[in-house]
Amino acid sequence: MGLHFKWPLGAPMLAAIYAMSVVLKMLPALGMACPPKCRCEKLLFYCDSQGFHSVPNATDKGSLGLSLRHNHITALERDQFASFSQLTWLHLDHNQISTVKEDAFQGLYKLKELILSSNKIFYLPNTTFTQLINLQNLDLSFNQLSSLHPELFYGLRKLQTLHLRSNSLRTIPVRLFWDCRSLEFLDLSTNRLRSLARNGFAGLIKLRELHLEHNQLTKINFAHFLRLSSLHTLFLQWNKISNLTCGMEWTWSTLEKLDLTGNEIKAIDLTVFETMPNLKILLMDNNKLNSLDSKILSSLRSLTTVGLSGNLWECSPRVCALASWLGSFQGRWEHSILCHSPDHTQGEDILDAVHGFQLCWNLSTTVTAMATTYRDPTTEYTKISSSSYHVGDKEIPTTAGIAVTTEEHFPEPDNAIFTQRVITGTMALLFSFFFIIFIVFISRKCCPPTLRRIRQCSMIQNHRQLRSQTRLHMSNMSDQGPYSEYEPTHEGPFIIINGYGQCKCQQLPYKECEV
């Protein structure tokens, strides 16, 4: 006996319920309302360049992305996006936004990217980004910000990239980035920064790239970057930096690239680069350096690329340390490194000038072997301590560890070059003469049997030639002489003279035969 269970609803009712469930699931994907003039792709709405003066109200509340780029929006009111809790990215760049009210982005807990660049924002309340706890990318570049509230970025612990380029910032508040523990990229370039606070970058333990180029920085103390324990690249080009110092002993082992191009650097602390043992790229083109101390160069052990062009290099004995280092450098340098002074070397490559004008008599490929003092007939320089130098009879105080760049005048090297060439040529001639004499003497002393054999061979050859000539001459005479036959006896030729020999003669018509 079988049991039969009958479903209380018929087949048509089941089909209707299934269709309704499918429609309900598709409602978010279909989008309830796409704003006019916008292009909608699933839950991503693109309303760029449509002339909007405010955020459209008809936007789907479940959208994941909203782009309002290149419009005419002038202000962001409080709770402007409160109902857009599902947004993951929001692009508001290239508008005319000048005012951002407190809590304008309230409710955007899932937002990961916020682009506000190329607007007219001059002030941001300290609670502007408080609720954006998942924000990873924030772009505030190309605005008119002149200052930042110390708590502006508080709570942004997942922020990875922050763009503040091309504003009017004059200072960086202490501990501004204290809560940005995940930040890896920070761009503060093209502002009006004049100095850096000691704790201005505190908290950035994961920062790898820092841009400070095109500011108004005049002095750099690398101790201010002490907290940047993961920094890989530092850009400081095109500021007004004249001095590089390091206020404390520490090791910045992560830094690999340092760009100081286009500054006014004249002096460098002797220990600056000792704190950067793994520095691979150092660019210092277009500064005001005229020499570099050998201690500075010897600390650049890991470099693969260096840029030193466009400086005021003085091609005198003071450039010997740099020339020696360049001669042994295994990497590459950007552009040519040319002499700036004196006039007769201007425009010459440093290495060509050093060898062509013989500026360095004891040029060594090992920088550490270079002398640390220079003496010439007119001015004497002797380092007596880290805080003073003697110039002649005067003592000049300097900052401890700073390479001195005092201007001095050196005699023209033309006469010395001519004298040296004459002496060198004379010594070469004398050496050649004595060398030849030495070779001859050694040959006579060490190889007499060989000479005797050569002499004997020569004499034997001469005897053979003489004998051959004699035989030829006798043969010619016998053909024309009065004797046609001669038969000597066995006693020898003297018997003929004594009458014991026989001579058979045949008288010729024109001569007589005599016995």
From Swiss-Prot:
Transmembrane portions of the chain: 422-442
LRR repeats: 61-83, 84-107, 109-131, 132-155, 156-179, 181-203, 205-227, 229-251, 252-275, 276-299
Subcellular locations according to the entry: Cell membrane; Postsynaptic cell membrane
Main location: membrane
Extracellular topology ranges: 34-421
Tissues expressing this chain: Expressed in neuronal tissues. Widely distributed in neuropil regions in discrete puncta throughout the brain (at protein level). Detected in cortex, thalamus, striatum, olfactory bulb, cerebellum and all hippocampal subfields (at protein level). More abundant in deep than in superficial layers of neocortex (at protein level).
Entry keyword ATP-binding: no
GO molecular function: neurexin family protein binding
Glycan-bearing residues: N57, N126, N243, N362
Any single Gene Ontology cellular-component annotation: postsynaptic density membrane
GO biological process, one term: regulation of postsynaptic density assembly
Domain of life of the source: Eukaryota
Cytoplasmic face of the membrane: 443-515
Function: Involved in the development and maintenance of excitatory synapses in the nervous system. Regulates surface expression of AMPA receptors and instructs the development of functional glutamate release sites. Acts as a ligand for the presynaptic receptors NRXN1-A and NRXN1-B.
UniProt similarity note: Belongs to the LRRTM family.
Subunit structure, as described in the record: Interacts with DLG4. Interacts with neurexin NRXN1; interaction is mediated by heparan sulfate glycan modification on neurexin.
Protein name, per record: Leucine-rich repeat transmembrane neuronal protein 2
Organism the protein comes from: Rattus norvegicus (Rat)
